[in-house]
């Protein structure tokens, strides 16, 4: 009898260990999947790591002073896209609203979806780089072989010349990286699948 009780305790103990390990693995996979969107959200809220600001209106003040803005494009592993700016750099007056274009093409034989993250260097300038319109605000799905032009409308906030850390900056780099994403399902589609299971 003593052996049976001890054996039951060992089985329960082993079950707890296995359950804990499985929960840990599932949690780590979930965190890995959520890391990019969570980090992106954190950076957008805080302006950390050169993240630009999203605005609804253009600047009222345009200075004579100019800044050179260079454009960078990257694609993360697992997303079979070509992605590049149409123009590598532009000289823009501080406060002037400008539109530039990036181009993406799906090299796969199936539809693929990506989401862009972005930053500005030098990092101190990120808080002064304001986007009015950007493809990075939503995920993008491209059909096989589809090519798409993606506009970005932005301005550099005139306040950049008043701050000690940023007033001497003459060149900014706007960089995008596209990451693979599972396409979002429309709410009606998710709801109908749930109802069918019930």
UniProtKB/Swiss-Prot annotation:
Q: Which Pfam families match?
A: CtaG_Cox11
| Transmembrane annotation, as ranges | 13-35
Q: State the GO CC annotations.
A: plasma membrane
InterPro entries membership: CtaG/Cox11_dom_sf, Cyt_c_oxidase_assmbl_CtaG
The stretches that face the Cytoplasmic side, renumbered to this chain, are 1-12
- Entry keywords, A to Z: Cell inner membrane, Cell membrane, Copper, Membrane, Signal-anchor, Transmembrane, Transmembrane helix
UniProt GO MF annotations: copper ion binding
This protein's source sits in the domain of life called: Bacteria
Membrane topology according to the record: Single-pass type II membrane protein
Where in or outside the cell? Cell inner membrane
Q: SUPFAM superfamilies recorded for this chain?
A: Ctag/Cox11
GO BP annotations, alphabetical order = respiratory chain complex IV assembly
Question: Any ranges marked Periplasmic in the topology annotation, and which?
Answer: 36-198
Q: Family per UniProt?
A: Belongs to the COX11/CtaG family.
Q: What does this protein do?
A: Exerts its effect at some terminal stage of cytochrome c oxidase synthesis, probably by being involved in the insertion of the copper B into subunit I.
Report the NCBIfam families cross-referenced here: PRK05089.1
Q: Name it.
A: Cytochrome c oxidase assembly protein CtaG
